[in-house]
Amino acid sequence: HLTPEDVVILPAFGLTLQDFENLKKIGCILVDTTCGSVLVVWKRVEKYAKDGFTAVIHGKYTHEESRATASQVERHEGGKYIIVRDMEEGELLFDYIAKRPGHLSREAFMEHFANKASKGFDPDADLEYIGVANQTTMLAKESLAIGWKVHEAFVEHFGEEHASTHFRSFGTICSATQERQDAVADMMEDSPDVMLVIGGYNSSNTNHLAHLCRQHTATFHVEDAACINIDTGSVLHKP
């Protein structure tokens, strides 16, 4: 059990609003290392909730950062969010907004996004006003594409004038993440024979970099130097 004498270091991806409030109640000494880029996203999502906009968050709903970001809507009564993992899942959202032929029924939509949306989420009422944000370590191009597709669906169903007042978007990719993704893209213009990507197997950043590299050349994702055995000439890497 934590006590007021304990020192708690808040991670770079932040904590959910509820967890943060619980720590404050205990009176722990808090060392907040939440990344500045993450805080920017939080402020944007909170503003969406304040203005009555549902936050569409491009991210992994199981990731600590996405959960912390989504929780920021709770600062305002009635705040809503829905988390979309990738473009494939995004298509379910786009089709529902635009009411395209074959779109999911309300029940099927709710079932699919049951664990990825705010409590009491109603797709027929809560997709009238939308603001787009993202987990800061997602692929930048995909985040931008998802935002554009949401806007496109709005225009298709409601018209351009409606979209201009009911849709908001804001680029929230971490600058360091963007720089690394851009660097990989530049390197792949003259693809090397092999790429070695070093980082945690559970790191969203590192996994995205490895994914980008695999599209062009043989890629090995390793956690650290211990994964490379010089004597045997073998590499222990993520499949």
Predicted segment positions?
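The feature marks the mature, well-folded catalytic cores of soluble enzymes
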Residues: H1-P239
